[in-house]
Amino acid sequence: MANERLRTALLERGTTIVEVAEAIEVDAKTVERWITRGRVPYRKHRFAVAKLLGVEEAYLWPEAMTPAQTAAVSETEIVTVYPHRWAVPKDAWGRLFASARQEIDILVYSGIFIAQDTGIVRVFADRADAGVKIRMLLGDPDSPEVAQRGIDEGINDGMAAQIKTALVFYRSLRRHENVEIRFHRTVLYNSIYRADDQLLVNSHVYGTFASNAPVMHLRKVPGGTMAATYLNSFDSVWDQARPVES
C-alpha cells in the first residue's frame, strides 16, 4: 500500500524524491519504494526524512513502532515535573523563551504573570527582532468560557480584566510584524508555553488558580508523541481564534 502521508509531505514541502535521496544518502529508487510500495525505512532514515520534511516520524510511519516503543520514547520527552507553577524557577521562563530560534507559542487565558514581567517582554521583542515568529493566544474577555473560568477561580470578572491588562503590557509587541495575538473561545485544560522543541505545560485544575497547578517541562524527541499532542492542540485553537484588533 502506498504511503500517501509521505507523498503528501513531499508535495507540501516542494521536495522531490531525488532531493530526499541525496539529502539522506540513499538511492532515489529506494525513496520511491517507500512511497509507492509503503516500504518502511530503517530508523535512521525515518528520522532523517522526518527532520528534512519537518513532520513527525510517527505520522509518516505510524506502524513502525509498537505502542510500547512509542510510550517509552514519549517518556523521555518529560524533562521534569513541577508540583505547582510557582515552583518553576523564576528564570526558567525567560531562559525558555530566550532559547527560541524559530518560534514561540503561548496559549493561556490571561498569562498575566508573563505579561507583567518586563524582562520576558523584552525577550519577546528581542526574539521577534531576530526573526522568531511569536503567536499568542489569549482568552476572549467577552466570551462565556472566560467568564466561567473567572467563576471557577473565584475571581469572577477579574479574569477578563487580567486579559485586558495583559494586552496593555503587550502594546508595543503588537506592532511587530513577527508577533501576532489572537483571542480564543476555548475551554482550556492546559496552558502551553512553547519555544521551538521545548514546552512548559501548566495543567488547569478545577477550583484552584493556575499558579497552584502542576507544570510539565517537555522536550520534543523523534518518535515521541506527547509534545506533538500539545503542539497540535495549540494549532487547533489558533486556527479557530480571531486576531486582536489594533
Model-predicted segments: where are they?
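A short, Lys/Arg-rich alpha-helix, primarily the initiator
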Residues: 1-19, 23
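Key DNA-contact positions within bacterial/archaeal DNA-binding proteins
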Residues: 18, 29, 58
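Recognition helix of helix-turn-helix/homeodomain-like DNA-binding domains
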Residues: 25-41, 63
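Short, basic-rich loop-to-helix N-cap that marks the start of a DNA-contacting helix
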Residues: 37-51
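Short C-terminal boundary/hinge segments that cap the last helix of small helical domains
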Residues: 54-69
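PLD-like (HKD) phosphodiesterase/transphosphatidyltransferase domain
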Residues: 69-146, 231-236, 243
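HKD-type phospholipase D/PLD-like phosphodiesterase module
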Residues: 140, 146-190
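HKD (HxKxxxxD) catalytic microenvironment of the phospholipase D
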Residues: 179-218
